[in-house]
């Protein structure tokens, strides 16, 4: 069985929907929100690579590597901020983060 472009787009659309649902349904835990954002970025990367492969151009695949690099840096910085915030406040609830000064 040969996988066509529509197969990849369906998988990417499902991952995107799961990521958006994770953000909408779970707004209390910031770690779940960060994981949902990463899932959305993964679905965008799947779209970039699948369209790039379908049209025979390497630009989308190279751009996907840059997006993965930025996503990894974003996740590392976000988790470092959360660890520092948890050490100061003792909670990582989204409601508590809104009360920060600065």
From Swiss-Prot:
Name under which the protein is recorded: NADH-quinone oxidoreductase subunit K
InterPro entries: NADH_UbQ_OxRdtase_chain4L/K, NUOK/Mnh_C1-like
EC number: 7.1.1.-
Reaction(s) this enzyme catalyzes, per UniProt: a quinone + NADH + 5 H(+)(in) = a quinol + NAD(+) + 4 H(+)(out)
Family named by the database record: Belongs to the complex I subunit 4L family.
First-level EC class: translocase
Described purpose of this protein according to its UniProt entry: NDH-1 shuttles electrons from NADH, via FMN and iron-sulfur (Fe-S) centers, to quinones in the respiratory chain. The immediate electron acceptor for the enzyme in this species is believed to be ubiquinone. Couples the redox reaction to proton translocation (for every two electrons transferred, four hydrogen ions are translocated across the cytoplasmic membrane), and thus conserves the redox energy in a proton gradient.
Coiled coil: none
A Pfam family: Oxidored_q2
Domain of life of the organism encoding this protein: Bacteria
